[in-house]
């Protein structure tokens, strides 16, 4: 049974859907996609459940979410292994994701009270009350790179606020979605409060176009997110929260400090998760001169020797495969395209077996107009620069704005950088892929809108209701002109 609709597991009636390991082609999961009628059934079930769920005390909703958190903790190793098999990420990495699923729930609960709770104050003889109310039925679209952690950054705040949910995982990771939905089932949520529909493009279109949803919470590619944005144009009654990707710049100052620490920070920024994090560094700005040369020499040497293997290998790998052979081919084609434009490979990516490829580092300084694309994989573009002002200007030459970073021991350089850079996540002497769960996550431009994360997700899961209240009506001492009683 593939889908969880109205408190029951049902088989799909759409096209066949399968999930294989990206490292051995082993069949992990199979079923049939949800048809348009089944998507409608899930949305209708969520609509019916919303009428009751929104009225339940917060403490009761919180108890169900906390029960889910305990189940995640109890099953964290199984979750980690499922994610590792389905995405190809090393087991050490998926274990941190499994822990994050439960860990961010406490942050979401705190956010509910701090950002969407109820406040009362007195002013000019009136009682001013701020309340928050749920929006209704929320469609949640999950990505494949963090198939457990990122969707729950939407789902948990939505449920706490009193919304109901229809969740569509990525078609690349249906098994992870099913395992997590089984835990929600065990947590005892009433029928219809959360629903699962599996499928690819057609299922996603049916859910996004449903007239019964009140909002859509999306984490995924910029292309899909922009299609959703155009689709929702002219529908201000629907909430649309988009967390998309970035063409993220990382600037290395001549004052970068320790060479090994800097190289390690770059590798963690560019190649962790095989480059399949939306905050990964895509463009590396390196100063001209001997210090920049030394940095690149060491970076190429260390990157060439990164351990690449299947998720459960011993000793543990740093990188696994990409999520699919198709994704690997996209990176290899991007490398070829950049070479054709005049890029010089410092370390050339090579296709291995299955979806494995080696990382690429390519000097693109000579390319007059660098394509503004997100290469979602282990491909790092290097640009040599003369001044920090030039580097920042080049770094800002992108339609995206997700993350950026500066490696520098000079406080004045950091002050200049943080004042002039355009990005939502800006780190100093830290990897670009590091972010706090209780900080805003996202950025301006084509990287999305709002700030989808455990804490700030509370903002788009409820709307504020402002009230001015008094126990009785009041008759002023002086009436408005033209009124006689």
Swiss-Prot record:
- Which segments does the entry list as coiled coil? none
Which EC class heads this enzyme's classification? Answer: oxidoreductase
So what does this thing catalyse? N-succinyl-L-glutamate 5-semialdehyde + NAD(+) + H2O = N-succinyl-L-glutamate + NADH + 2 H(+)
Reported function:
Catalyzes the NAD-dependent reduction of succinylglutamate semialdehyde into succinylglutamate.
What is annotated as the active site?
Answer: 243, 278
SUPFAM superfamilies (alphabetical): ALDH-like
Say which family it is in: Belongs to the aldehyde dehydrogenase family. AstD subfamily.
Which Gene3D superfamilies does the record cross-reference, listed alphabetically? Aldehyde Dehydrogenase, Chain A, domain 1, Aldehyde Dehydrogenase, Chain A, domain 2
Pathway assigned in UniProt: Amino-acid degradation; L-arginine degradation via AST pathway; L-glutamate and succinate from L-arginine: step 4/5
| EC number in record | 1.2.1.71
Classify the source by domain of life.
Bacteria
CDD domains on file: ALDH_SGSD_AstD
Any idea which UniProt keywords this protein has? Arginine metabolism, NAD, Oxidoreductase
Which GO-annotated molecular functions does the record name? succinylglutamate-semialdehyde dehydrogenase activity
Detail which positions bind NAD(+).
Answer: 220-225
Q: Which organism is it from?
A: Vibrio cholerae serotype O1 (strain M66-2)
A Pfam family this protein belongs to? Aldedh
Q: What is the lineage of its organism?
A: Bacteria, Pseudomonadati, Pseudomonadota, Gammaproteobacteria, Vibrionales
Q: What is this protein called?
A: N-succinylglutamate 5-semialdehyde dehydrogenase
The Gene Ontology biological process terms listed for this entry are:
arginine catabolic process to glutamate; arginine catabolic process to succinate
Q: Sorted alphabetically, which PANTHER family does this protein's record hold?
A: ALDEHYDE DEHYDROGENASE-RELATED
């Amino acid at each position: 049974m593939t889908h969880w609709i109205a408190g029951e597991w049902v088989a799909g009636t759409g096209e066949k859907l399968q999930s294989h390991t990206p490292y051995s082609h082993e069949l992990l999961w199979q079923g049939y996609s949800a048809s348009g009628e089944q998507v409608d059934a899930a949305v209708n079930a969520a609509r019916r459940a919303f009428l009751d769920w929104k009225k339940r005390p917060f403490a009761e909703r919180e108890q169900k979410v906390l029960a889910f958190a305990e189940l995640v903790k109890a099953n964290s190793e199984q979750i980690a292994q499922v994610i590792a098999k389905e995405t190809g990420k090393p087991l050490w990495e998926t274990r941190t994701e499994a822990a994050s699923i439960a860990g961010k729930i406490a942050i979401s609960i705190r956010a509910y009270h701090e950002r969407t709770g109820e406040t009362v104050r007195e002013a000019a003889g009136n009682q001013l009350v701020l309340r928050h109310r749920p929006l209704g039925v929320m469609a949640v679209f999950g990505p494949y790179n963090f198939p457990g952690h990122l969707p729950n950054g939407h789902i948990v705040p939505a449920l706490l606020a009193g919304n109901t949910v229809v969740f569509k995982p990525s078609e690349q990771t249906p098994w992870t979605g099913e395992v997590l939905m089984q835990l929600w089932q065990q947590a005892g949520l009433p029928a219809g409060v959360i629903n699962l529909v599996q499928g690819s493009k057609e299922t996603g279109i049916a859910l996004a176009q449903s007239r019964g949803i009140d909002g859509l919470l999306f984490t995924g590619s910029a292309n899909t997110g922009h299609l959703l944005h155009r689709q929702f144009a002219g529908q201000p009654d629907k909430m649309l929260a988009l967390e998309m990707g970035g063409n993220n710049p990382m600037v290395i100052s001549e004052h970068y400090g320790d060479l090994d620490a800097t190289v390690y920070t770059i590798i963690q920024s560019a190649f962790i998760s095989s480059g399949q994090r939306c905050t990964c560094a895509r463009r590396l700005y390196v100063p001209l001169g001997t210090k920049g040369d030394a940095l690149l020499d060491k970076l190429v040497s260390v990157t060439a020797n990164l351990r690449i293997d299947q998720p459960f290998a011993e000793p543990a790998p740093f990188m696994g495969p990409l999520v699919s052979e198709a994704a690997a081919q996209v990176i290899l084609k991007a490398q070829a395209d950049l070479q054709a434009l005049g890029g010089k490979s410092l370390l050339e990516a090579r296709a291995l077996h299955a979806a494995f490829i080696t990382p690429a580092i390519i000097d693109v300084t000579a390319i007059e107009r660098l394509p503004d694309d997100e290469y979602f994989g282990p491909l790092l573009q290097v640009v040599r620069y003369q001044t920090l002002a030039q580097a920042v200007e080049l770094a800002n030459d992108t339609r995206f704005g997700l993350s950026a970073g500066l490696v520098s021991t000079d406080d004045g350089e950091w002050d200049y950088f943080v004042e002039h850079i355009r990005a939502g996540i800006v780190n100093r002497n830290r990897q670009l892929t590091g972010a706090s769960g209780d900080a805003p996550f996202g950025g301006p431009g084509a990287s999305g809108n709002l700030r989808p994360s455990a804490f700030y997700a509370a903002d788009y899961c409820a709307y504020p209701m402002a009230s001015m209240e008094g126990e009785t009506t009041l008759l002023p001492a002086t009436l408005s002109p033209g009124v006689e009683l």
